[in-house]
Amino acid sequence: MERVWPECTTRCRSLQHALDVISVVTRASEQHIKVFLSSYCCNAVTLKDDFGRNATHIAASCGKKNVLDWLITGKGVDLAVKDKESGWTALHRSIFYGHIDCALSLLKHGSNLYIQDKDGYTPLDLVMKDRPPHIVFKTSDPTELYTWGDNVNFTLGHGTQQSKHHPELVEMFPRSGVYIKQMVLCKFHSVFLSQKGQVYTCGHGQGGRLGHGDELTCLVPRLVEGLRGHPCTQVAGAKDHTVVLTEDGYVYTFGLNTFHQLGIQPPPPNSNVPRQIQAKTMKGKTVLGVAAGRFHTVLWTKDAVYTVGLNGGQLGYLQDPNGEKFVSCPRQVSALHHKDINITLVSASDGATVCVSERGDIYLLSEYQCKKLASKQLNLKKVLVSGGILEHKAAPEHLKENGGQPASVFALDQAGRVFCWKSPGSSLKQCWWVYGRQLFMSDVALNKNEIMFVTQDGEGFTGKWMLEKKKKENTISNIMCHSDSQNVYEKISMQKLPFVHRAVSVATDPSGCNFAVLQSDPKTSLFEVPSVSSSVFAEDFEKLLNEANETDSIHDVTFQVGTKIFPAHKYILALRCDFFSKLFSSGEINSLDFPEVHQKGEDAAGCDLFVIEKIPPELFSHVLQFIYSDTCDMLLQGHKPKLWHKEENENTIICNFQKMGFREDIEGKSAYEVYKNSRICAENEKQKGKTKQSKKTRSIGDETSPVKMLQNTAKKFGLSNLSSRLDGVRYENGRINVFHKKSENKLRFNQKKCSSHYDVMMKSEDGKEFHCHKCVLCARLEYFNSMLSSSWIEASCCSQLEMPIHSDVLQVILDYIYTDEVLTVKESANVEFVCNVLVIADQLLIVRLKEICEVTIAERITLKNAAELLEFAALYNADQLKLSCLQFVGLNMGALLEARSLDVLSDDVLKDLSEAYRKMIPSMNKRIITPYLDGPDISILQSEDIESLISVQDDIYSYQITQEATLKKSKAKPKKKQRKRLDSSGGYNLSDIIQSPTSTGFVKPEKTNSVESLQDLLTSDSEGSFVGASSPRDLQSPDLFPVFTHETKETICVERNRSSPPVANGAASTKMPIPTTSSPKAIPMSRITPSTSPNWVAMPCSPASPVTMDLRAIMELEENIQKCGAMPKLNAGGTKPGTHVMKLSQKQRKMMAMSSKESNNENKPAKVTVAPTTIKSPAKTWAAAFHLGENKSFRDLLLEEKQSVTSFPSLSSDVKKSKHTEELDPSELARRPSGTLNQEAKLKCDVPNQDNSNPWHLTLSKNNASSAPVTFTAIVEEEEKQEAALIRSREKPLALIQIEERAIQDLLLHYQAIDNPEEYITIERAAQIPMATPMWNKH
């Protein structure tokens, strides 16, 4: 498109321009958008429409990632700009519309992930709100524990004393498959309760507070063995002791007992193991809950509360008149002993205890009093207390006078509201969150400095009380806060916790130094789980048996049963059948066991051949089928077995024949008489044995049953399993009836057994050797079947088989091949190892093993490795794993975006992730920005600015069609021409030409006139044209089509029809297209009639003025000037446009000259065609010209060569002069011998930077006779140089090629050639010197 300077400046604020920009961004392609934004307006990237949206907002909303990157890197747009409608940045919009690839690009360029919109939502909040509605986080779900803090006393459970600034996963629990449901953090230790009721502790063990029976420090959580047999439901802890409640309602305590807080009688100083509290006051009572403070322990039942420990005012009792400071046995709080009272919640701190009844009454036990704080607070979910003031006289060595903090009580109801009471004397108030949006809580934790919250959406927050300021009277805020005296709020400022997105519970220690949050397992809602296909183990070996033949290289034993041959495999037979194991190990079998088997030499493949007699081949086939696949047709319901009567009939006939005998009494009798006598004898014998036969009828019927026959055969071979399974099978009405099906054993092989039958040895890349069996490898894997059963070198190699696989992975592959199971993979916790197995399984096409690996990896997906596994699955075509990873990433998008874990993904995978994420959210179907069609017309951009890219594709397509048409025409045309061939040993074959590689170009000829030239080449005289070629294969295959370059050459193709008569003038005109230029516009064609003289016409001209020359002279002159791209003319007939010139010897050129001279003497009209061609091949100095000179003898040529050697050095000056346009007389050019033309063309080809002046106004050359012929020695030298250049190019090292490729790519980036709408830049290797054409040598 012609560049139009914009009518605005860099401060343009035109609303119309903004609308046009947004319209183009919504509907145009990325390339067109860049062109439009660069040329339409000087301020196009920052203009905003009525809604405050700019080009960056719309590009992020439409998923135009390339445009977005171009705006950020090239235009430097501000990513923090918000729109007017919602206050959204480009990051908000990209996430809202589901374009995760754009969101990651924005994050990489510094976009703020925590910036809030008008409603207080950050981009992460949008992800959270888009979570599918079926995902609800519960404490009963599988969970993960995250902790952070100063970790001074090893209370976080990470195994180190290093502090954690952000929530980090406690990896001990996921590794052991433990899910936590409650955690308690104290100053010196932490307590964790699993969902199965097991208790884990870590921290400092002084005093036995960990319950492990010692006082050692535990860096990671350790199971309390004393409670292993007692499933627990609740835990509580304080600074020095721990309290545990079991499912049976029993309470166990352990730790220091300084203040008698353990409740054990008699009070010990401490307890290193859990001990049960056994108090007479609680006999028959079922404890529902426990709580603990530093100085006391609280237990409660349905209707009573019991406390024990130091009485500093928090136990709910009055001071003891006898001065007793400790309560050693649990004692009921009498102040809460009301009628019909039901205790639901209890909590304790160091200096206070709070209780909640079923009626909603809240009581505070502090300062020796029981205060009722509120009533009718129904549906409370949790209550907490912090602080409290103790009487320092109760423990002067531990308490300070006027020490402690005022008590604070927090209550959480089922609706997610939080109520607060602060001492002294205030009322219960609802908390008011100072945050951008409304929050509803699901859990709360309290310490002396702040409050920890978990919302119903899984978010985590920390809150602090806001200091009250003096408010002016009659202000709006004052009116809002005091409009209702009963609805006063407690303001709490909120700050969101990072990396918390699926929280269900939160905990903190009393001092606020360490924290813990319980999050739902990220795989909880994952339903795209890989599956493993059914096993094909038995089918593989049954296929091996069916495909075995006597000539393959896999079988190693053959059995001849009757007239049938059964190739088999010794390892499988010996492992599955004891009979064959003995047979192969000893070489012979005991005649008493099986007298019908004997060895009979070798088969056709040189394997052992055994003959088995007195067994039908069909029965033996069933036996082999069972051995190989652990089943056979006789065990299938409804099978119709064959009955084997043929052998019995044959035996009867033979027996009768033997009974007839050859006695002398039958001599001279007819056959009828002999037959009649034998029949009479047979009837007599039948009558005699009638009674005996009736007794054996039943046994004979059993013997003829195929099931019984197979069962007897199985017993002979020692197949007890087959025999026992046939007991549940009957043969009824010609079918198999299975009335009792016994359980089948899984078919498995053992690699280490039958070591005498090893025939393959594999060697891993780390040098470990594995002995294997060829038959098992070939049966299980097509990879080994193709390698070992064919004529590859591996099949006949006697040494070990080198496998580029590590020994650990190779062992897994072999275990799967032999057993169809991979316990090593299923039990492995190393995901990288399983991934390595999957890679090898993918390479060896082991589909089922790959599926097993996918299932194992999917079970081990975490937030840390999800992105890497997704990239891995996409790389190795693990489709099931990829679907699991895509859904996992989509369900945990917020956590992964905040952790920047998705930065490792490639662009293609990010595009797939964006599509999967949009499909996961149903509302994404409605979030589509409709293209604005009222903007400027961008069709001009498509037709002009991007025309070069489109025209190149069109040229390729159209010229391919032209090539196909030319080949079809060349096949049909030879029938019309006379073939003149003196010797069939030379020349080209048509098949060789058609099968030769063609060079594609960007030329669109109007008409292809090279067919005649092709036929002339095919039918040319082999002696005159290709003398010296021993066979057609020794010649280089011609390239029928030109090669593309940026330069455009012209070639004159002269075609003579040797058999057809002259054509009348004007009968057929030939189009002559002008050579193409860089401009896409077409140039009018000029015509020439066949009546044009075939000879060059010399026109009178003046040396002082340019002369209009004949077209043919101009074209030949242009050809000589640009001889680097000229065509060789093999004879007077036509030539091929753009063919690669082949190498001709001196004798060949001489014979060509002779044949061309004879053809030139014939006065026949010629058709002249000018075809535009583009050549990128080096010039050939021996290229023949159009007008060949007179024929000379070999002696004359030698004399001429000697003379030219002496005068050749003087050509340098002439070569320099040839850089400029020469003044050449066309008549003199026509009379000049061909050798001179060739020499001049050669010299001009070597001169770079020729002046491409107008060919219609060329001046004549004044010194056109100072040229010398090229010698034969120079031709040979140039041949050697070109051959050396070809060798250097062929032997160029790969490292150097890669460096060149890298340099090309760097240059393309430097000049911004990729997707550049303004200019088209290409970078290619430049050929330094001419190079010989590579040729294939036939060996």
UniProtKB/Swiss-Prot annotation:
This is Inhibitor of Bruton tyrosine kinase. Residues 1214-1231 have a biased composition (Basic and acidic residues). Residues 689-698, 970-980 have a biased composition (Basic residues). It is a peripheral membrane protein. Keywords: ANK repeat, Cytoplasm, Membrane, Repeat. PANTHER family: BTK-BINDING PROTEIN-RELATED (PTHR22872), INHIBITOR OF BRUTON TYROSINE KINASE (PTHR22872:SF2). It comes from the Eukaryota. GO terms for biological process: release of sequestered calcium ion into cytosol. Residues 685-704, 970-993, 1058-1089, 1208-1237 are annotated as: Disordered. ANK repeats lie at residues 51-81, 86-115, 119-154. The keyword Membrane applies. The keyword DNA repair does not apply. Pfam families: Ank_2 (PF12796), BTB (PF00651), RCC1 (PF00415). Residues 555-636, 758-826 form the BTB domain. GO terms for molecular function: protein kinase binding; protein tyrosine kinase inhibitor activity. Acts as an inhibitor of BTK tyrosine kinase activity, thereby playing a role in B-cell development. It is found in: Cytoplasm; Membrane. GO terms for cellular component: cytoplasm; membrane; nucleoplasm. RCC1 repeats lie at residues 142-195, 196-247, 249-302.
